[in-house]
Regions:
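Amphipathic alpha-helical segments
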Residues: 32-54
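Metal-dependent catalytic neighborhoods of phosphoester/phosphodiester hydrolases
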Residues: 176-191, 207-221, 324-328, 348-352
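Core dinuclear metal-dependent hydrolase active-site scaffold
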Residues: 91-164, 236-308, 374-423
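Long, structured stretches of catalytic cores involved in phosphate-ester chemistry, encompassing
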Residues: 303-375
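Active-site metal-binding motif and surrounding structural segment of the metallo-beta-lactamase
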Residues: 130-133, 145-200, 302-319, 331-335
């Protein structure tokens, strides 16, 4: 098999490891490097005919993307003294500047209430761009049975009844509660929605740590890659750390991918999450997905107060995810929890990170209690909460997950649901 680095000049320095990034994409890691060696690697690429496509620096983290027969992405992180060189043969170029588009809609963020009748997770965020198209994040679990239809109807409603246009669909990672309903939409509702591009970076289904992940993750990754590959009209952008891309009037910066976890173990599949910082209408929204301990270390070490934002999606549904320090640095006025009230209440005393995020915020919102609509730029007091649409089927939940609750608790939860439903 041809070595992808045969046609890419590489600095004369021993590597600390070579990583299979998936789909023919590979990465070389060099430790004990300097910024001068980063510049040398860039010069080698340029002298070999690679064209500088994009450059973006964050504090003392330097990133350049070059294009030739393959895409070469090179970045150096001073805090780690580490240089990474990624060779990507399959990605599509992204927009490096804001798109020239109509100004016909209010830029708005929604935390969507996924159907939690049978499941306590899932995550779907939608951002309406100023031209009325959407950038959306993740989707819902297979047990949110009707959410493929609910998501399309929601986007249609906020498109003025027109066929929704998704300018970009981003996936943090390939757990079923984040991708399953997207797959159903593409396979069964393709004529009802236009999807221009998908943005993601997943590890291979046969990753070196895949034996920790279980058969379900293997099957979901295989299905996702097949469905996306067969959707030939959808552009596929493979994201790498430090890249800054634009979708309509929205700016995104890639903060972390599974490539940054290497050479450490990715036993916890949540560490495969790609984290994004979005800037919209001058305000920042941080989406860490389900980022966990290893990803958290990467972002704290590299970015510090660059993580400051106006709105933060709390990692991993408020279960064990990013650290309390992550939320101190984010210091967001609005915290979003893609979880049910039940699980939120269970985790609150256990998770210092949740308590820190809430203590710092002026407001926080739990997805199961109703879709939250946040006009951008974010201003405290302008968030609208929609009536609650779904409620737990406790018999079904017990049969699936063996979660059992007292009659008193179930009655209390139902009474609270009725208040939210009728508000």
């Amino acid at each position: 098999m041809k070595n992808i680095f045969d046609d890419i000049p590489v600095i004369k320095k021993g590597t600390s490891g070579r990583y299979d990034c998936s789909k023919g994409c590979e990465m070389l890691l060099f430790d004990d490097c300097t910024n001068a060696e980063y510049n040398l690697q860039c010069s080698l690429l340029e002298n070999a005919g690679f064209i500088l496509f994009d450059e973006h620096n964050i504090k003392e983290n330097y990133h350049r993307t070059y294009r030739s027969a393959v895409t070469a992405h090179v970045y150096y992180c001073e805090s780690e003294k580490a240089l990474r060189l990624v060779a990507d043969p399959n990605t599509t170029p992204y927009s490096t500047k804001p798109e020239n588009c109509a100004d016909t809609a209010k830029t708005t963020l929604w935390q969507f209430e996924v159907d939690h009748t049978l499941i306590d997770c899932g995550m779907f965020y939608a951002v309406r761009c100023k031209d009325g198209s959407f950038f959306v994040i993740d989707s819902a679990h297979m047990y949110s049975v009707n959410d493929d239809t609910r998501i399309i109807e929601f986007l249609k409603k906020h498109s003025g009844g027109k066929k929704p246009v998704v300018a970009g669909w981003f996936f943090s990672h390939c757990h079923e509660d984040h991708v399953a309903k997207f797959l159903d939409i593409v396979e069964y509702h393709r004529s009802e929605i236009d999807i221009e591009a998908v943005y993601y970076n997943f590890p291979a289904a046969d990753h070196r740590d895949a034996h920790y992940w279980g058969e379900c993750n293997y099957a979901m990754t295989e299905r996702f890659e097949r469905v996306v590959r067969e959707a030939t009209d959808i552009k596929k952008i493979n994201l790498h750390t430090g890249q800054r891309f634009y979708v309509r009037n929205l700016e995104f910066v890639v903060l972390c991918t599974h490539e940054d976890v290497f050479p450490h173990s990715m036993e916890d599949f949540n560490n495969s999450s790609t984290a994004l910082m979005m800037t919209a209408e001058g305000c920042k929204v941080l989406f860490p997905g389900d980022a966990s301990a290893e990803s958290d270390k990467v972002m704290l070490r590299r970015y510090g107060d660059y993580l400051k934002c106006d709105v933060v999606q709390v990692s991993h549904h408020g279960h064990s995810g990013t650290s309390p320090e992550f939320y101190r640095l984010a210091n967001a006025e609005c915290a979003l929890f893609a979880v049910t009230q039940i699980k939120f209440d269970e985790e609150y005393p256990r998770q210092e990170a949740n308590r820190v995020a809430i203590d710092l915020a002026k407001e926080y919102h739990i997805a199961s209690n109703g879709t939250a609509e946040i006009p951008l730029p974010y201003v405290f007091g302008q968030t609208k909460i929609y009536p609650d649409e779904t409620f737990e089927d406790f018999n079904g939940i017990f049969n699936l997950w063996c979660y059992e609750y007292s009659d008193e608790m179930k009655q209390k939860l139902y009474e609270e649901f009725l208040k939210r439903k009728n508000r």
